[in-house]
Design a protein with these regions (language model features):
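Gly/Ser-enriched beta-turn/beta-hairpin loop segments
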Residues: 47-73, 92-105, 140-144, 157-158
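Short, glycine/small-residue-enriched coil/turn segments at secondary-structure junctions
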Residues: 31-36, 60-91
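Folded interaction domains in cell-surface recognition and envelope-stress signaling
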Residues: 44, 67-68, 76, 107-108, ...
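Zn2+-dependent peptidoglycan hydrolase active-site motif and core
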Residues: 80-115
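Polar/charged, compositionally biased leader and regulatory segments
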Residues: 1-56, 61-64
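Residue-level recognition of beta-strand microenvironments
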Residues: 47, 89-90, 117, 134-137
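Generic structural motif
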Residues: 40-44, 72-86, 112, 125-128
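Conserved, short, structured surface segments that act as functional micro-motifs
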Residues: 123-174
Length: 174
């Protein structure tokens, strides 16, 4: 027992600075003025609507929609809407292969109906980089056809992505 104590005293704690990543490397910032880019250019099949229900053709029912459902052909490239870190990659029966991306400041982008992802959980993706490709639609979107499910959240609650996207000439749902 004495030898252990002596050894502990013989090796004082070193007072060395701890190296940490710079703020720019570790903290993401979502610029609400700059907004986001369209992850896929295509017709809006289903618009964001959390205030009133909209008709979902495949389901043959009216529901609120926390996302944009953007038409795309199978194998179309899906681009990162903003710089962010891949938080999670999951598979579910509604949106298929789904990617959650932390954009910073409480904002999260969710991309669904994907395949052949180019990134893994923990990777940082720059705006405009290809995240993956449009997949065959799940059974929940079979009538709508192949598409990208694109949701934007602030602190875990859906917000309208169109409030942060530039207008497109093909945007027919305004």
């Amino acid at each position: 027992k004495e030898k252990v104590e002596e050894k502990a005293e013989a090796e004082p704690v070193k007072d060395e600075p701890v190296t940490r990543p710079t703020v720019a490397e570790s903290v993401l910032h979502f610029d609400t003025e700059k907004g986001i880019a369209w992850p896929l250019e295509g017709e809006l099949l289903l618009d964001y609507s959390m205030d009133q229900t909209i008709y979902f053709p495949t389901l043959e029912q009216y529901r609120c929609n926390p996302a944009l459902v953007i038409e795309g052909a199978v194998n179309d490239k899906v681009f990162s809407a903003a710089k962010g870190k891949i938080m999670d990659i999951t598979e579910n029966e509604v949106t298929g292969c789904t990617v959650k991306q932390d954009l910073g400041d409480g904002y999260t982008a969710i991309y669904g109906q994907l395949k052949e992802l180019n990134f893994k959980t923990g990777d940082t993706v720059e705006a405009g980089q290809v995240i993956g490709y449009v997949s065959e639609p799940t059974k929940y979107y079979s009538t709508e056809g192949s598409n990208l499910y694109f949701e934007l959240q602030k602190d875990g609650k859906p917000v309208n992505p169109k409030d942060f996207l530039p207008e497109l000439p093909m945007d027919t749902m305004e």
